């Protein structure tokens, strides 16, 4: 007697697909990569599993964008702040949220600076907008609205990572007067002014072109199936973390940072990812860089960034007279979590330069230097596990 055929729910089907994808993925990448997966995992655990990445803000605000989308904003204000120092506004990147700035928020607040962080539309706890609103120009409008609501007066320092840097460029294009009158410094971190079709995603130029050509279409087709994808991702959690670590960082980081990054990336709705992926291809704010010529500018990026490589940062520096270019060895795209101490120090130096340059003619030439995080490199070497395939758990 034959058994009755059972129908499978999308969740159970997704879990099965997830397990299958994990197995297939491991088989595809081969024994060497499997060994690396578990070795990297042991190393990540050895580096620590501390997972307190929260900051208790002084104030939480909801800024309503011009099209009605609620934008989540957090304000960190030091005790006794009198407005004499500039407000630092941090804009995060694509598929991240304001949690990525945890180390910079802590350091800047401790140093006595007022800090504003916000979730871009469709990211974190901000609301979602219409599909056509997911473009860089709209993000610039959103940033302007945040400034109007929570930092309407006083000097500003605008820092942006990846798509957050593009957001700052969009604002510079739309409102050069704001930059001339109030913005005293800009930090452009692991970002690009255009030419994102050149991204190789760390898989070489040929495969990179394939991903760039077919990736947006694939995301569009997947976007109605968010629940199924979530089930698939849960089924291959360790493989997911492995590829997040490989694509986001250029050196070993604690497993807790990998998980934080994965949580932000995979917590972003597919519809949002798909819409922004299409608009990123058309991003070009090279001409807007000229509007930053009167400010102190920091350009900060890593040598192992597979998304916004040195080509992009060099192009930005060449377009902004006096910009400081800091190129970090052993650093990937999520550089503010990977090398927080280095970035924090560069932000402090940027603020110092901005204060010293008040009323002076903008510099005609900045400096370019490559740095190595020696403290982190020593820590990584001390905790590096021996070769082997003993599976690590955490």
Predicted features along the sequence, with ranges:
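Active-site loop/oxyanion-hole signature of alpha/beta-hydrolase fold enzymes
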Residues: 123-179, 345
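Flexible "cap/lid" loop of the alpha/beta hydrolase fold
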Residues: 173, 177-228
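Conserved HGGG/HGGXW glycine-rich cap/lid loop of the alpha/beta-hydrolase fold
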Residues: 69, 74-127
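Short beta-strand/loop motif that positions the catalytic acidic residue
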Residues: 292-293, 299-301, 305
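N-terminal cap/lid segment of alpha/beta-hydrolase-fold proteins
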Residues: 47-77
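Hydrophobic alpha-helical topogenic segments used for membrane insertion/localization
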Residues: 8-39
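Conserved alpha/beta-hydrolase catalytic His-Asp/Glu region
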Residues: 222-291
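Catalytic active-site module of serine/aspartate enzymes centered on a nucleophile-bearing elbow/loop
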Residues: 4, 318-394
């Amino acid at each position: 007697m034959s058994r009755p055929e059972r129908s499978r729910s999308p969740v159970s089907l997704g879990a099965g697909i997830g397990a299958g994808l994990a197995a297939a993925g491991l088989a595809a990448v081969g024994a060497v990569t499997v060994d690396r997966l578990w070795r990297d995992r042991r190393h990540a655990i050895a580096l620590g599993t501390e997972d307190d990445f929260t900051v208790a803000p002084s104030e939480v605000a909801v800024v309503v964008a011009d099209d009605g989308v609620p934008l989540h904003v957090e304000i960190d204000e030091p005790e006794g702040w009198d407005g004499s120092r500039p407000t630092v506004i941090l804009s995060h990147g694509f598929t991240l949220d304001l949690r990525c700035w945890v180390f910079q928020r802590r350091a800047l607040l401790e140093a006595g600076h007022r800090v504003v962080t916000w979730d871009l539309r469709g990211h974190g706890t901000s609301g979602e907008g219409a599909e056509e609103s997911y473009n860089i120009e709209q993000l610039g409008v959103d940033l302007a609205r945040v400034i109007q609501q929570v930092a309407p007066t006083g000097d500003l320092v605008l820092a942006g990572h990846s798509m957050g840097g593009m957001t700052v460029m969009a604002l510079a294009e739309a409102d050069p007067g704001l930059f001339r009158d109030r913005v005293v410094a800009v930090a452009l971190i692991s970002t690009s002014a255009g030419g994102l079709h050149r991204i190789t995603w760390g898989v070489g130029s040929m495969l990179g072109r394939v991903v760039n050509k077919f990736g947006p279409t694939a995301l569009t087709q997947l976007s109605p199936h968010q629940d199924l994808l979530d089930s698939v991702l849960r089924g291959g959690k360790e493989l997911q973390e492995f590829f997040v670590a490989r694509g986001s960082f250029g050196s070993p980081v604690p497993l807790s940072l990998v998980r934080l990054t994965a949580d932000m990336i995979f917590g972003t709705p597919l519809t949002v990812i798909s819409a922004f992926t299409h608009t990123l291809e058309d991003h070009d704010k090279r001409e807007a860089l000229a509007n930053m010529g009167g400010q102190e500018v920091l350009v900060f990026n890593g040598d192992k960034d597979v998304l916004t490589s040195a080509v992009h940062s060099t192009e930005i520096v060449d377009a902004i007279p006096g910009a400081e270019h800091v190129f970090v060895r052993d650093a990937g795209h999520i550089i503010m979590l990977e090398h927080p101490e280095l970035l924090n120090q560069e932000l402090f130096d940027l603020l110092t330069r901005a204060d010293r340059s008040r009323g002076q003619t903008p510099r005609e030439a900045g400096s370019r230097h490559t740095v190595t995080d020696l403290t982190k490199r020593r820590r990584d070497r001390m905790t590096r596990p021996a070769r082997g395939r003993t599976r690590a758990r955490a």
